[in-house]
Amino acid sequence: MEESFLGDELTRLRSNSRMSSWRSSQSIREVFGGSSDVFMKNYSTRWREMAEEEEKELKWAAIDRLPTYNRLRKGMMKEVMSNGRVVHHEVDMTKLGNQDKKVLMESILKVVEDDNEQFLRRLRNRTDRVGIEIPKIEVRFQNLSVGGDAYVGTRALPTLLNSTLNTIEAVLGLIHLSPSKKRVVKILEDVSGIIRPSRMTLLLGPPGSGKTTFLKALAGKSEKDLRVNGKITYCGHEFHEFVPQRTSAYISQHDLHHGEMTVRETLDFAGRCLGVGTRYDLLVELSRREKEAGIMPDPQIDAFMKATAIDGQETSLITDYVLKILGLDICADIMVGDDMRRGISGGQKKRVTTGEMLVGPAKAFFMDEISKGLDSSTTYQIVKFMRQMVHINDITMVISLLQPAPETFDLFDDVIVLSEGQIVYQGPRENVLEFFEYMGFRCPERKAIADFLLEVTSKKDQEQYWFRKSRPYVYISVPEFSESFNSFQIGEQIIEELTIPYDKYSVHRAALVKNKYGISSWELFKSCFTREWLLMKRSSFLYIFKTTQITIMATIALTVFLRTQMKAGTVKDSAKFWGALFFSLINVMFNGMQELAMTVFRLPVFFKQRNSLFYPAWAFALPIWVLKIPISLVESAIWIILTYYTIGFAPAASRFFKQLLAFIGVHQMALSLFRFIAAAGRTQVVANTLGTFTLLMVFILGGFIVSKDDIQDWMIWGYYLSPMMYGQNAIAINEFLDDRWSAPTNGSQPTVGKTLLHARGLFTTESWYWISIGALFGFSLLFNVLFIAALTFLNPIGDTKAVKVENGDKNNRRPQETAIVGDIQMAPTRSQANTSSVIPFPNNESRKGMILPFQPLSLAFNHVNYYVDMPAEMKTQGVEEERLQLLRDASGAFRPGILTALVGVSGAGKTTLMDVLAGRKTGGYIEGSINISGYPKNQTTFARVSGYCEQNDIHSPYVTVYESLLYSAWLRLASDVKTETRKMFVEEVMELVELKLLRNALVGLPGVDGLSTEQRKRLTTAVELVANPSIIFMDEPTSGLDARAAAIVMRTVRKTVDTGRTVVCTIHQPSIDIFEAFDELLLMKIGGQVIYAGPLGHRSHKLVEYFETIPGVPKIRESDNPATWMLDVSSSSMEAQLVVDFAEVYANSNLYQRNQLLIKELSTPATCSKDLYFPTQYSQSFITQCKACFWKQHWSYWRNSQYNAIRFFMTVIIGILFGVIFWNKGNQIHRQQDLLNLLGATYAAVMFLGATNASAVQSVVAIERTVFYRERAAGMYSELPYAFAQVAIETIYVAIQTFVYSLLLFSMIGYQWTAVKFFYFYYFIFMCFTYFSMYGMMVVALTPGYQIAAIVMSFFLSFWNLFSGFLIPRPLIPVWWRWYYWASPVAWTIYGIFASQVGDRTDELELTGETEKIQVNEFLKEYLGYDHDFLLVVVFAHVGWVLLFFFVFAYGIKFLNYQKR
């Protein structure tokens, strides 16, 4: 009907239009004759516009007649035809295609910098026109204090001893037997204020001042282990009255995303989960009022509002809008990437984190350091867009920035200055300088106000800003500032406002969100299901690998247990069938264990999204469960199809399908179990340890390793709780109750099959098969429920951070202490600081840390090009080129004593150029010349004379600051530098970089624990400086720092340059002070092209003069930061506006010609000069490298309590459990089953704890490997000393672990107490655990990532398990596989232990189903193939295994580099 009506209307319109056109043309011809073509054209244009307008009105009238539900889903989009005619189409907004979205966004935001404000005003005007009020939120906080408890001093370091003492103290504290040794640490102290809507607030404060804690508290996301006191209200309502996590959005400074998803997919998922909020209700009311008023809305605005008001869409127009304003549209379809997967840049990743919350409907935003990694121009644009949103849409917003440029600072309405947990100022930006002048401090000319605000509370920096020369300067502390602000006019006004309660009844009903989630439960499930399916597709390699692995294992199993070798029907024939059944079972279980690593890997993103109420835990867990069911079906089917009939199991078809069902049940149970363990453990080390321990208990009590009848009576409950027992019963009953095992026997059981089941303690009726199947699926359900419960109630394990304690404060705390508190980072009081705020140095300051001699070197590069293989995702978009060019004809020169800045917008290629010049690229294709003081660069020698400060600040987490520096100096300074000189040099560098107060602080992991970002930056700089290099590359040394910390780093850099070194820095957001501290600039644009290379000049006048000579470039204003102005005027949009290519302008300039002459001069060796030469590749000898690496590994292991404390704890627990389960079995060898139980005990004792070691060590080695890549690139050591140190320290801890384990097992199992037997027992277990650890290390070295390493490890462990001699004794292994028995290290260990402990015994042994007896040693030789006389060979074989794995590990890290740069 609607289409018919619309068609009739259009026909009438066209008919009327034709008649009107004819009449008009006739009258025109009559009046003007045929002579006025101009008038005719104008009239024709006017007529066409009228017709188009009329057509638009008619189409809107048709839409307006639709029912409300349909009307809100229909919009109009215009299309400009090739002849210039505009046609309006009716579009279903729920089915917008990519092209439709692109057209709509282009029509709304053609040039985002110019059009965004106008677009937002058009949106707002539409609501204002019909009198709809937009909800607003005012946030108040009164007497807000946040604190926590922390250990201080040496107790703060997480050593094994401290961890043990802390655990004991915590347990005793629960029962009030021991007072806590923790100290109270205050993070925020009695702060009050108001965050107003429609005003954008800047939060300033040095790292450690409590900014993150403050923002989290306002957003209702304070850490659970912190004490929060005071009152926070939204429009007068406290947190319990609404859902603060959905009313507001906290944007973290840490970028946690799924690397497998593209930028667009990441934002689409966030938008889908967060929902549309009140956008749909607003649209309903808006549409109703417009219809009543007869108002026709702007079609573009109407289409946008409708497209963004429909929830549950897989992809939304709001995503396209956010991508556009954040500048992410250029990388929208590129993977986000992670540590081992190439993706977008760090700055782009930071914007993705911001965009993830902007796509949601929140009305208040608390943004934590959103500019980290962004250049000042990009930051300015993003903050400008935020300002437009705040002012036009009445949003409440607080943004924390570290180094805001003056023009970015001017965008804010209000400023909060936070220092040492107290508010120093809160109020209008315009009045902030007035307050500090009221206090006696004035901001100097050309000093950024933000920088001044950060420094004026510092004791060291404060005096330089004192302007009341008539009065003597006295230091004003932070509490004094805070108190004075309360008596300042603005402070008094805030206090007065806080005394007047907010009128809760005037609050807009849509302002505060009462629903916990943004969409319905079904939509949440669909969203998470879609994402899980996407992640599975992107990780398809893992599943293909797993499927291939199980196929290979099934093939091996069928050749080991080949049908032709498998006779059935008698008790003697059953051994191989038991082995085949148990191997199948254990293989399926181990295959499920790979789920553990994959789940732990996903948890950080899950916790972030769960806490932001994207979805509940069940919505995350159920899709994983559902989508893994087909995986279980496929993997189980592959195993059964390949093995069932080829091995020769019961031939009935029904039994084939019953075994398949059993294996599906076991596989589902295993996947669910390990998912639950991953969620409970939450970290790789803890989860791995718990996983292996659980496997151990499930297997031991499962009825195969030890039969039910031999389990202690008081532990029989464990037998019935073991899921493995039900799997074992199901497959055994299915096989042995078949007709071919029904031959009668003379024993207590009527048939052979039942005799075999009874001997193993299994059930003997068919009904128990179905009971077992029900139990397996019941366990699967239970573990999935527990998985959901763990995800719902558990939080990430609270890692610790170092806290510096004040010196000389009112509590008389001792200096140079560190304290540990969960997720707290406190700064030192400014009384403790020993820094200057400006880059120029006092005249009396000595330049320390550079006393060792060095050779000044220059670096010249000419016509450098760099290519990488074209990314697959770009090829899918139609790009045909095979290579992507990242650097294009880059040329320049860096000279001694000259500090060069390498600047460009995000993605310009700054880091790429630096990596190419420093020789840090691991892939790609490099063209062009690079010369060092006239000679072609040789990377081996260049590494000795250069330093590279990486952007990511990678360091070993478990050593202190002083140890990191001493280690670097030890390995990188010349071997003739004496130890005392080296230590003095380190001390001087620490003073230079101002790390003295942090000498004993633990480094920690970036973004997790340990040092703050700015402290880590200074450490990175110091680590390179102690190497005494001639050329230093610094990748964004000031990124992530506040202005004061950046000044400290740059002052250090300046001192370094003034000693005659060559220093190059990439830099993102330089203040005027920092930018003008550089001597020269190399400016790049997107595409990797140089657009300026030359001197800056006094106050950057040479740079300014160069760009101002280019026609059309706007002049710089007096107050502008030259760095920001430079990036603005050279941006891509400015190029498009001026129709100019700045790279081409530079290439045709005189400056370029002069630079080419300089490059030519520096590329020619000086007279009488020599090329760099070192007699050895490394500074230190092989022995010294080993000593240094071992020294660092020693401290790393001693402080890695999570790894070692858990390892020793599990060793004791497993040892005791084994001892209890196998109590005195060594003295009770009378029956064949007794000996098999003992063999099972030996097998389990070495296999499971050994596998635990192999699995747990992988995460330790993986973390250290990233540090190894940096240190190797720096030429610190060769691979063998590193491998030696890693292996040596692990071996020492294994030796201690083995002693504890051996003592427990040997004494409790009841082996014969002789020195020789105990030595053998200890030796074999020690060597076993050692080669297991070496194996874990080796697999990490050979694989690119932790997940792949876990899969590869379990694959070969299955081999070792099959050929260990337990599942199938060596004499029964087919001759074509018997060689692999000797290739299984576990087989040698079991051989060694069993032969040494019982191989010489001559006791009589009863055989199952036989009347004759046999001596133990004879049985071992005949049935198991163990000979006591072969022990010496076994002893030396273990040495061979250890050495083999060690050398493969060493050569793996030597020749394989999985770091992608």
Swiss-Prot record:
Residue ranges constituting the ABC transmembrane type-2 domain according to the UniProt record: 523-736, 1184-1398
Statement: the UniProt record of this protein carries the keyword Zinc-finger: no
Xref: SUPFAM superfamilies: P-loop containing nucleoside triphosphate hydrolases (SSF52540)
Gene3D superfamilies documented for this protein: P-loop containing nucleotide triphosphate hydrolases
Disulfide cysteine pairs (residue numbers): none
Domain ABC transporter: 172-445, 859-1111
Domain of life: Eukaryota
Name under which the protein is recorded: Pleiotropic drug resistance protein 2
Organism this protein belongs to: Nicotiana plumbaginifolia
